[in-house]
Amino acid sequence: MAKFSKGQISIELILLMTAVLLAGILVSVNMTRFTFEGDILSDVREDAFQVFEISTDTPIIVYSLNFSNVKISPSTNLYNAWLQINDTGNDTYLWYYSDGTFKGLANTSDPDESITEENLVLLPHEGYASDIIFRSNVPTAMSWDSYEIDFNDIKKFEIIANDVENNPISYSLTHGDSPETSNQAYLNIKANEVTIIVTKANDKVFEVIANTTSGTIELLPYTETSP
């Protein structure tokens, strides 16, 4: 039977206790790291909020949007078209007529370009867009998940896709029940993850946001930022 002196026992005991303590610390660190990373990953929802340039504590809602049969009238001025569709195919469509004669949906990105038959697109027409701008007599209020906003003094809407590559705006334009020669068209929009910008009659521009604290839809002053 081996014999140990008191000094040997003390040193070996210290070494043994140190080894056990270090092993415990390593296990604790590994468990903490796993738990921490797991919590972070489970709580983060990608694109749940948009970072807004102005100072506000109000979360910006990522909307899923569905507009059906929004009535669009033609415009004589391409700079102020009642409908502008920026298609993902790099085409720009404007709802347009000239000199009192109905022309149609013009495929042009240049407001100074003269509209010819070659520029016109017959309805129905559908596609995917990065953003859509329209002026229309929309319903007096818009609701989203029990939130509601009065649009009485809104003169222009801009719907912008937040992720064009994966979630472009799906749109279609038809004459509805009207004849093909009608100067009215009806716009249908389906989209996920969009930003809604509105311009009031006084030309002030706002972003539509949902205030989850007060349970209302509000308008925040909008400042366009460079991409």
Swiss-Prot record:
Disruption phenotype: Disruption of the gene does not change the piliation compared with the parent cells.
Organism: Methanococcus maripaludis (strain DSM 14266 / JCM 13030 / NBRC 101832 / S2 / LL)
InterPro entries linked: Class3_signal_pept_motif (IPR007166)
Motif (QXSXEXXXL): 8-16
Positions of the propeptide removed during maturation: 1-7
Compartmental location: Secreted; Cell surface; Fimbrium
Induction: Expressed under standard laboratory conditions at 35 degrees Celsius.
Taxonomic lineage from the root: Archaea, Methanobacteriati, Methanobacteriota, Methanomada group, Methanococci
Domain observations: Contains an amino terminal motif QXSXEXXXL, which is part of a class III signal sequence.
Keywords: Fimbrium, Secreted
GO cellular component terms, A-Z: cell surface; extracellular region; membrane
Main localization category: secreted
Mod. after translation: The N-terminus is probably cleaved by the prepilin peptidase EppA, which recognizes the class III signal sequence.
Name of the featured protein: Probable minor pilin MMP0600
A matching Pfam family: Class_IIIsignal
